[in-house]
Amino acid sequence: MPLKLAVYPGSFDPVTYGHLDIIDRGLKIFDGVIVAVARNSEKNALFTVQERIELLTEILKDRPEARVETFDGLLVDYVRRVGASVVIRGLRAVSDFEFEFQLAQMNRNITRDVETLFMMTSVPYSYLSSSIVKEVSCLNGPVDKLVPPLVKSALDAKFRG
């Protein structure tokens, strides 16, 4: 029986405990989860794509069923190319739903071979976003409960040299 793979796409700039929660929950459902770092989200990124890949790879090293890759272009093309059939998306609030629903419908319009699975963010992370983490860290606020220690160190290096 073939492995059931899912793709969890995002910018992960930086990865947060909210992202890791979705990955871990996805691994309970699927045989493998590909964490796909979007190359085309480079515009206002704090971390380069390579830095994000390195952070994610190190953080996920004890999760052999999760692998980190990059992609550009249409997500559904990438999903089909890697042999997956499901896209995982985390929803923090109703405000996320409208945008995510539109993306899922567009992907469905392009191909019926790819499904989107919406996962509600666990309550402790319902407010958490990479943007909030960057802003708090930039202002020298505490982010140790929001991101893994490796990410906190990387943020400190970016903002405080």
UniProtKB/Swiss-Prot annotation:
Coiled-coil intervals: none
Catalytic activity: (R)-4'-phosphopantetheine + ATP + H(+) = 3'-dephospho-CoA + diphosphate
Biological pathway: Cofactor biosynthesis; coenzyme A biosynthesis; CoA from (R)-pantothenate: step 4/5
Cofactor(s) needed: Mg(2+)
Pfam families: CTP_transf_like (PF01467)
GO cellular component: cytoplasm
Site (Transition state stabilizer): 19
Class of this enzyme: transferase
Subcellular compartments: Cytoplasm
Record's subunit section: Homohexamer.
Family that this chain belongs to: Belongs to the bacterial CoaD family.
Protein name: Phosphopantetheine adenylyltransferase
Source species: Citrifermentans bemidjiense (strain ATCC BAA-1014 / DSM 16622 / JCM 12645 / Bem)
